[in-house]
Each structure stands twice: as structure tokens, then as C-alpha cells.
Amino acid sequence: MAKNVLDLLMWHPKWDIERCRISYLHRGACRNLKTIRGSDIERLERGFMILRDGSSIPYHRVVKIVCDNSFIWKKQKKGIG
């Protein structure tokens, strides 16, 4: 789950969330996808993250997390059957 990965990136001394990019579904954006920097995140709440500009993004919209050009997490597509 994206929340667990973001918590780890935010609080574990090995990781630096400011070196990460988070892509999420955003209707109206190019390809309905928008990417923010980890430094744009002010805090993590139970069901969503709060950005420094005051907006919020639900975790279920996060599709991938990349740090230092390496995939850290990617949302799994739901299969049929």
C-alpha cells in the first residue's frame, strides 16, 4: 500500500522522501497523471497526504513512487478471476 511506503520514506533514516517523485491519478492532467516531489508533502494522514499548498491526495490514487530514478513502489493492476 502506498501509505506504508510513504511512511517508510518519510521517517526511516535510510530514506529521504525529498529525493522521491510520487505520481498519482489526477483527472484533467495530461494522461490523467500528475507527479509531485516528495518535498511537496507536508504530512501523511490516515487516508490521504496533505501537500504544502493545502491540497490533499488520497493514497488510492497513487500509482508509483520513484526515488533516485529507481522504482520504489508501483500500484498493482487488479486482475480478473
UniProtKB/Swiss-Prot annotation:
The lineage of its organism: Archaea, Methanobacteriati, Methanobacteriota, Methanomada group, Methanobacteria. Pfam families: MJ1316 (PF04457). InterPro entries: MJ1316, UPF0248. HAMAP family: UPF0248. Belongs to the UPF0248 family. This is UPF0248 protein MTH_1281.
